Structures are given as structure tokens and as C-alpha cells.
């Protein structure tokens, strides 16, 4: 997948004047083509060039960064999140409003997260790989970067759509599964796997 370049970034004033339109379009795109919910408190947002373009534009808008060298440094960081061929890259997001741990509602904590906790279930189980693996990454905030490496067989299952595909997360007493991935989302992920 092509990396973001400085020429792709709108000047701050241009982006600001169209931000509402971009934001609404971005949210619709995420919800329909890029987001998977696991229960009520966890989401996966699969990143690609389009999602990261908006994210970077927002960072530049909020920080008022306009220096091309600084902008390029930011692009270099975010370009690492653009998936390579045969890879799905996602943000793993834990809702900060998640209710506290109770016996009937075991809470999930990022401190308990390991790559094999989260799996893509096709006709086989594919564990995720943590992009952020340091202990301090796992103890801060409500988000992680993860990726899935798919072989040709798994890619064809995503494309074909006849075999169910979903995500499953288990840790200690916590278990959450997504619904079967809808066609639009599978097609969007298939595009990621080709680039």
C-alpha cells in the first residue's frame, strides 16, 4: 500500500475549512468498512492509507504543525501503520467507559493482553501480533496497535465470503466475539491484503 507523502497533506487552512465534511465522511467510512466490535467495550479499527490520512491531518490541525521537516517525521511514524501485503493492521481500542470488574462482568485489561488473546477465526485460528510490545505500552491508555499476518488460504477466505470470519478475544474470564464480518468490511480488508 502506498505510503503517505507531504504532497498528500492539505494545507491547514484548506483542511480546516473542509474538516466537517472530511470528518463525517471518515466516520461513515470507519463504521461501514473498517470497524469491528467485540462486545460492548472493545473495537478494532483497521487502518489503511485513507484512515491514516485523516488521522495525520487531524494531528497537524490540532498541533498547528506546518514545518515540512516535522510533518515528514510524523508521516514516517504513521506510515509504519499502513499495512504491508498479506497483513491487516488495526488499532485495538478499549472503551474508557467500560464498567468496573464484577463477578458477572469480568473486565478486560490491556495489562492482560498478549497476541494470542485475540484471534481471527476463519477455518483456522490466526493470532494477532502486537505492534506495541513493551510493558509500558501495555500499561498506558486504552489502545494498542496490532496486526494479523495472513497466508494465501486465509486471504482467499476473506475474499470469498462463504466461510464465516470473525474475531475472538479471550483473557482470564473475559470472552468477546465479533459478529461474522459483513461483506463490505471483508471486501475492504481484501483490498488491504492486495497492496
State what each model feature region is.
Residues 1-89, 96-195:
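Long, contiguous binding/interaction regions
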Amino acid at each position: 500500500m502506498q505510503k503517505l507523502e507531504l504532497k498528500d497533506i492539505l494545507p491547514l487552512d484548506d483542511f480546516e475549512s473542509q474538516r466537517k465534511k472530511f470528518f463525517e465522511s471518515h466516520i461513515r467510512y470507519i463504521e461501514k468498512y473498517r470497524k469491528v466490535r467485540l462486545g460492548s467495550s472493545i473495537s478494532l479499527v483497521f487502518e489503511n492509507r485513507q484512515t491514516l490520512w485523516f488521522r495525520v491531518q487531524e494531528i497537524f490541525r490540532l498541533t498547528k504543525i506546518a514545518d515540512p521537516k516535522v510533518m515528514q517525521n510524523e508521516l514516517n511514524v504513521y506510515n509504519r501503520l499502513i499495512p504491508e501485503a498479506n497483513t491487516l493492521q488495526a488499532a485495538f481500542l478499549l472503551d474508557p467507559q467500560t464498567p468496573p470488574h464484577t463477578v458477572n462482568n469480568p473486565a478486560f485489561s490491556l495489562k492482560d493482553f498478549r497476541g494470542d488473546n485475540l484471534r481471527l477465526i476463519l477455518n483456522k485460528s490466526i493470532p494477532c501480533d502486537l505492534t506495541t510490545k513493551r510493558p509500558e505500552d501495555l500499561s498506558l491508555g486504552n489502545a494498542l496497535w496490532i496486526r494479523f499476518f495472513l497466508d494465501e488460504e486465509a486471504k482467499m477466505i476473506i475474499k470469498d465470503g462463504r466461510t464465516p470470519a470473525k474475531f475472538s478475544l479471550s483473557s482470564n474470564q473475559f470472552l468477546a466475539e465479533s459478529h461474522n464480518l459483513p461483506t463490505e468490511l471483508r471486501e475492504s480488508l481484501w483490498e488491504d491484503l492486495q497492496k
